[in-house]
Each structure stands twice: as structure tokens, then as C-alpha cells.
Amino acid sequence: MTGIRCFVAVDLPGEMRDAIGRLQSRIATEGLRLVQLELVHVTIKFLGDVPETKVKRVTDALSKVTIAPFPAHVASMGTFPGRGDIRVVWLGLEGNFEELSQLVESALSVVGFEREVRGFSPHVTLGRVGRPGPETSRELHSKITSLNDVDLGCFTVDRFYLKKSTLTRGGPIYEDLAEFAL
């Protein structure tokens, strides 16, 4: 069955994206594909292909999520996997993302989505390594270690989105399907 490839996310304000762009330039390494700044976000839940007939029910369910706006900030920088050849470089975030995630999971379970069994780890993907290898991993580990205490400032999470993701050869294209104020 095909449908609309969807996910729930928090967008970052412009000044945070600018700071992330400066950070990306400091970790740029051959083999690391940096995420375009306009695509940077915090994924709360990936839904996969949602039948068009179900999108309204998803939107209605998400509109019932109630949580106060909350402050957030970058708390760490790391990689997936944590050991061995790096595949993803990310920024870890602190804030009330865990509660938002749980509320989104609860709301979507009512309309038939399975709850995520893995623990939620709020993060922003900075880049992906196309062909992981020891040389690229060593260089990235060195750069990340030197930037470990980076402070990108704080921002307020006051809304989240249901987004459509269209995969193209040039990379994904995201479109907001619905916005939910906190």
C-alpha cells in the first residue's frame, strides 16, 4: 500500500539553524554528507507511508496533544554507532522532548500506530557518512572531541509539525501538512 511518507517533528528557529551551519563547517570531512540547513529538524516519530484517507485522523489525533512550550538546548554531540566506523553525526538535545514524544505516541496509538519500543533520543542529524571507514571516522572523532563543549544557545519549542517527506535523487523534500501550537 502506498501513501504519504510522514513524520512528526520539531523545527529549529533560524538562529539555531545558523549556529548549526557554522558547526557543520567545522566538522566538514571528505565522505560526510551534511544535512541541508532547511531540512534540519528533531524527529519525534516517523510514521512511514500513511494512506491519504488516514492523514485527517492523524492530524485530528495530534491536535489533542497538550503540553506547555518548553526551553531546549544542545547538550552534546555524538555519532551513530557510538563505536567503530561512523555512519551519522548528531547533536543531542535537552528539553521536554521525552514528554512530547510520549504524548505523540499515545495520541497516534489511538489511530492505529504502534508505539516505538526503542527509547527516544532527541537529536538533530548533522550529516551522514556515505562510505564509512577508519580514516573518516578518526578524522570525525577528532573534530567532534575538539567541539564537545560547543554552546549553540537555547530556543523555545512552542510548536510541532506533521510533515510529508518526498524522496528524490537530490535529497528529501519536506512539506508541512499540519502545524500544532503548544
What are these regions (language model features)?
Residues 1-182:
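Histidine-dependent nucleotide/RNA phosphoesterase domain, centered on the 2H-phosphoesterase fold
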